[in-house]
Amino acid sequence: MSSAAGWVLVLDTATNTIVVAAGTPDGAVIDSEAFEGRYRHSQELLPAVQRLLERAGLHLNDLAAVVVGTGPGAFTGLRVGLATAKTLAHELGVPVIGVATSAALLETAGGGAARLWLPSGPRDRLVVVAGDPPLLVHDDSAGTETDDDLAIDLAGRASEAALERGRGALDRLPESLLRLGLARLGAGDTDDPERLVPAYAVPPRGAPASEAEGGVAWSRDPR
């Protein structure tokens, strides 16, 4: 890739899998890496970016934009990912574009009736349907996944088929995040770093999981 064309950095730390990728402005993935974060996102993310630069022969001075997954996901991972994306964008004077990790994962499934299942603490799960707010449900809903559903980070708490589809979605996450991010960038729709916040996989205030009857609407919490 010509350095004059610039390149796009893609980061996602919403799940236990850290995703780092580089792409071209026309949507081709140059290189990517995905690995288990082991709850060490703050120690693992920047070294992964450095490895990406070295493998692909890229330079930060040629960076054109940063695309970052915004969740829903775990508190620590998301904060590290967004802080890194914002810092790089600010220091290099390039736009930052937030993309819902859930939307990118569901996009890999081609839309349709697929639902995404994510952990929300030790006893509850979030279920996400494209275009709708996530719902918080009890873990006793395990086994209700359909043939189209995806499950992430729910080993032992979701069907093996849904977990396998989730692993496949994670494999395709770099391409999906890049595609969705570039669509926003092409429309001139970028984020103000001061207003870009993650979506945490926690119950909404005032509606603890123990009081949820089958599922409660969940909203972004900018804490």
Each PLM stretch: what is its role?
Residues 44-47, 79, 83, 87, ...:
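Short amphipathic alpha-helical face segments that pack within enzyme cores
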Residues 49-65:
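Phosphate/pyrophosphate-binding loops at sites that engage ATP/ADP/AMP, CoA/4′-phosphopantetheine
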Residues 37-54:
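N-terminal phosphate-binding loop and adjacent alpha-helix
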